[in-house]
């Protein structure tokens, strides 16, 4: 896809990011990954994010990422595949090139590694990555990589292939400033952990979609919530929030890293061989998996 095509795809429906399965030797397990991606692509997600945050990008080596992208492309049918990308500038540029060579449709630029940086440094980083690829690029505003509206506007002027903005800050004032300033120059995605909890607020700030983690294991329920959100059906949204998302949030909040580990547990519980999370994350306890299993069983469709 060219940058404008991936921009349109990103804004055309509910998105998700498959977990990355590992085998007993802690290696990427391509076969179960492809089985899961093929299943997810049947639930009308226009884009799936391979090797994203929930796909444990932070635990992958740069060499593993193009293999994951190739596996996703082979099994996703018509669903576009956007890859995670990040770390320091030169590593990120290399990942962008390798993803493009592997057939990826775009990249999601996650925060750089560890240090804080001034706006000029963030500008230089994003610009350098955009210049390394012909694919569409989406920036992920969160943690130590928060672009301000003026910086983002400069990047949009200088980088034609910068087509998307994903927010993980929860700063509605900033994101509304960005959407007011940039208008339809970008596609906007909500990116808070368990994005459904914030979806109504982000919709009011002109974010029409988001990436759903729970789509990994309850895609029909995720689609039902998204359809209700877009239809203005507040009663259905509140019903699903109360019956599923708030209990899931309580479980997810028990330990740091469970925003990923709980999703991977959910994927295992619905029958896919996702394997464990990689260190430094920890898997749910047996008791916690039983709680999650009961929650899933109550919402099977």
UniProtKB/Swiss-Prot annotation:
Q: Which SUPFAM superfamilies match?
A: Aldolase
Q: In which pathway does it act?
A: Carbohydrate acid metabolism; D-glucarate degradation; 2,5-dioxopentanoate from D-glucarate: step 2/2
Domain of life of the organism encoding this protein: Bacteria
Q: Which GO terms describe its molecular function?
A: 4-hydroxy-tetrahydrodipicolinate synthase activity; 5-dehydro-4-deoxyglucarate dehydratase activity
Matching InterPro entries: Aldolase_TIM, DapA-like, Dehydro-deoxyglucarate_dehyd
The catalytic activity, as recorded, is: 5-dehydro-4-deoxy-D-glucarate + H(+) = 2,5-dioxopentanoate + CO2 + H2O
What keywords appear on the UniProt entry? Lyase
Query: EC number(s) of the enzyme?
Result: 4.2.1.41
Q: Which GO terms describe its biological process?
A: D-glucarate catabolic process
**What family is reported?**
Belongs to the DapA family.
Quote the protein name from its UniProt record.
Probable 5-dehydro-4-deoxyglucarate dehydratase
What taxonomic ancestry is recorded?
Bacteria, Pseudomonadati, Pseudomonadota, Alphaproteobacteria, Rhodobacterales
